[in-house]
């Protein structure tokens, strides 16, 4: 995680030296996004009383959907609040010593406040590239394990940070398209068993996603 954050931070700082976009189109906007979410393998720590064990989780791709409301200033900066749901699948995890097993998903809902900076590297008056970062509150993180008709779920809340980069293209005076990449990092989340599921799981949550969206300025 630290290496990924370091690389993204360097890229963010370098982008601030690029040519800014200071067009006089300040004002509010709304954006709706959808995308393909992914997550690298994670270590899951399972605890049940005095019993503790560890397992490795391998995750497949999944989906992301959400929206944001923001305001763009006339100096290249904008700020926004967003809500996002994302989920990735796993084909089967086994946590020994009485831990859960089976296939399922690893999902979250979150709200965030993002700060973003726009600059011009595409040379088009209609296009704006951007980078940014956000503070994230995970209103729920949930991992499910399904075997047949039986399901065990573990959930919790947490905080994290996210890094964003992308581009926007105007398709009219108010409408625009958006394409971007995002990475979220939340460490050592405590996920409690639900509905009689035994024990607790401690895990990192580090999804990344490629997104497309459409927005409207007001």
Roles of regions detected by a PLM:
Residues 1-27:
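Cleavable N-terminal export/targeting peptides
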Residues 24-27, 34-40, 68-146, 205-218:
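Gram-negative (and chloroplast) outer-membrane scaffold detector with strong preference
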Residues 37-65, 154-159:
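Surface-exposed strand-loop-strand hairpins of Gram-negative outer-membrane beta-barrel proteins
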Residues 42-50, 91-99, 141-150, 189-198:
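Outer-membrane beta-barrel translocator domains and adjoining extracellular loop/strand segments
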Residues 43, 83, 87-92, 163, ...:
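Predominantly the C-terminal beta-signal and adjacent terminal strand-loop region
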Residues 62-65, 108-112, 158-162, 176, ...:
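Transmembrane beta-barrel architecture of outer-membrane proteins
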Residues 66-72, 166-170:
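Short, conserved structural micro-motifs that define repeat-unit consensus positions
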């Amino acid at each position: 995680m630290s290496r990924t954050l370091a690389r993204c931070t360097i890229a963010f700082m370098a982008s601030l030296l690029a040519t800014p976009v200071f067009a006089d189109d300040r004002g509010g906007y709304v954006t709706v996004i959808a995308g393909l979410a992914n997550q690298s393998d994670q270590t899951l720590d399972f605890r049940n009383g005095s019993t503790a064990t560890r397992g490795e989780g391998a995750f497949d791709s999944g989906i992301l959907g959400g929206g944001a409301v923001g305001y763009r200033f006339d100096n290249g900066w904008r700020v926004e609040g967003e809500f996002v749901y994302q989920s990735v699948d796993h084909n089967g995890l086994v946590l020994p010593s009485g831990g859960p097993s089976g296939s399922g998903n690893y999902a979250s809902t979150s709200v965030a406040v993002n700060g973003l900076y726009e600059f011009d590297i595409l040379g088009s008056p209609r296009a704006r590239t951007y980078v940014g970062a956000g503070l994230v509150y995970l209103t729920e993180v949930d991992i499910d394990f399904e075997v047949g008709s039986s399901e065990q779920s573990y959930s919790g809340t947490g905080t994290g940070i996210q890094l964003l980069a992308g581009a926007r293209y105007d398709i009219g005076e108010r409408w625009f398209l958006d394409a971007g990449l995002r990475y979220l990092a939340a460490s050592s989340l405590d996920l409690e068993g639900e509905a009689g599921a035994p024990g607790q799981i401690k895990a990192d949550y580090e999804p990344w996603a490629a997104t497309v969206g459409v927005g409207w300025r007001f």
